[in-house]
Amino acid sequence: AKNIRVIRFPAWEPIHNYPLPSPSPKFFRMLFLLRRERPDIVISRTRFFATSLLALAYAKARGIPLVHIEHGSDYASFNGSIKTFLGKCYDHVFGWIVLRFADRVIANSQASASFVKKLSGRDAMVIYRGTKTQIIEQCVPDQKTVEAYRGKTIIAFIGRLIDGKGTRDLITALARLERTDIVTFIIGGGPEEAHLKKMTTKYRLENQVIFFGNLPFEKALGILKTADVVVNPSYTEGLPTSVTEAALCRKAIIATDVGGTREVISGSGDGFLIPPRRPELIAEKIRYLLDHPDEREQLGKNAYAEVSEKFSWDRASDHYIEILSGLAENKKKHR
């Protein structure tokens, strides 16, 4: 894109997907060069990433307003109680600092705003992020996939394969179903993929669970559009993009009632909301939708009606422009 410059600093990952700046000469040279830049606003996203703390330090050192955008609605969930405890400790120190000292905090859901209040004691403005509605509307189901699995009812999951997404519960639910008339698509990649494949082997589901890995957005969407039911079994969410996209694809949705999911679908006629970590309930709802195709179709239509007007990039952009312009103007007045 024009007028966008990406600067990538060297990093290492003590925990997968949570990079820390590498204290190398290259990193410190880049920090020094950033002193020449004259931004009007600094923006950080999600308080438990080290980049948010780095953005805060840079903004305060330069006297530049910091806008923090929070996506999380709970403490980070890790595979292991020790990691989860350490993550919570990090949040109560460094996450709190980011949220308390940012000039403005924006949350992408009411659930995220509630968590900001809980962790830091301050209020956050809610701006729902938009969706690529036009692209989703124009995308057609992948015809090769349609032909390959004709006659099967298709269940789909789309998202990162990390512990917090609860994908193990979906595999466990499929094992409980013992149905041969379905196939399940896992669209996305991540550190959980190897373990999930072992689970499918253990439960003899190798021919019923298809792993697509990471795909370009439109290709992934084409696969998603072939599905009859979309399952989002997450343990924690801010505002789940996958649920929003599934609704815009007019799919019947089974999702865990966590974070901002209830702000996408209500669970009353537009999909099923269930508690997290309950694979038996996932199996129960899938079985119901398999046996009631007409209701499955109606749930998808209702979900689309709920979401199509609510998540608009035009509306979100207007809010952001108003906030950023106001902060930049205020900064100029106080120079």
Question: How would you label these PLM feature ranges?
Answer:
Residues A252-A255:
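Short hydrophobic beta-strand element within catalytic cores of glycosyltransferases
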Residues N214-L215, G222-A227:
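Short alpha-helical donor nucleotide-sugar binding micro-motif in glycosyltransferases
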